């Protein structure tokens, strides 16, 4: 699902890929605003239950084991959780300890740079960051317009 834009064209909407290894987690990610659900870690039984409860077009079943593969920019999918962890490791932070704020900030930057898909377990917060970034960039209309008359 790699989307390209023409030079000078508007960047397409960034999609949020939530993580759903079981039916409850998948339903929660969808309810919190995930456009797609990553079901690659689901067991066959859980996958069958997820397929019953969610539309097939929202399930991500890409066979690649690592969505960042060798070249994250050519993959078209950026994992905000993994990118934030890599940044923390480069700064000398504790391995495996990433704050939600770092994940949200990483998702906002990726969205600003035009990433077509961002994957995260922090679905609600990352959805808000993607929407905020799109609004600031002018790619999303405001949810409510208030006009004041003096």
State where each predicted segment sits:
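Active-site-adjacent loop and "lid" segments of alpha/beta metabolic enzymes
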Residues: 1-32, 40-150
